[in-house]
Amino acid sequence: MDQVHRGHIAVTDHTGKILWKLGDPERLTFARSSAKPLQAIPVVESGALEHYGITQQELAVICSSHNGEPFHVKAVESILHKAGLSPDQLCCGSEYPMYVPAEDALKIAGIPRAPIYCDCSGKHAGMLITARHLGESLENYTALEHPVQQRILSVFAEMCGVETSEVQLAVDGCGVPV
């Protein structure tokens, strides 16, 4: 067997009535990286993509996790550069790439861990360009109180059909509420 996936499944109708289930469909789940496409919606809605000329490839790295391969890192650097931002402004924690050949190359070259290599750096770049475009503070953009995070919370609640007060949050591995 190649892989095993565990989970809880619910099939619902358009009203949310459960038609079929397996496991516990009421179990709370931490969204983690599966929330990245939702976290990217405010980037799109803000007009930052058009304003900074963000490409489809760059949007893809904003919406996803990446392995830190050179083309991923270049995409994140490009996003930041287009908005006049620096990789030093990323608050996602310093990492080596998950892509082992890239990690090995950095170590051989004596290059330390850095936020740009974090698998979540694209998402963070999207948050930063949104704040920059809307004239908001770039400081503490990961805090729940920051307008960037409040917009993400509103999108998440809307997509789930609940009030923002009903969304139970925790801080994910890269420092943002999810």
Language-model region placement:
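A short N-terminal beta->alpha junction/helix N-cap motif
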Residues: 3, 26-34, 64
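A common structural microfeature
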Residues: 6-8, 38, 58
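Proline/glycine-anchored alpha-helix kink/cap motifs
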Residues: 10, 41-43, 130-131
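Short, solvent-exposed loop/edge-beta patches enriched in aromatic
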Residues: 14, 45-49, 84
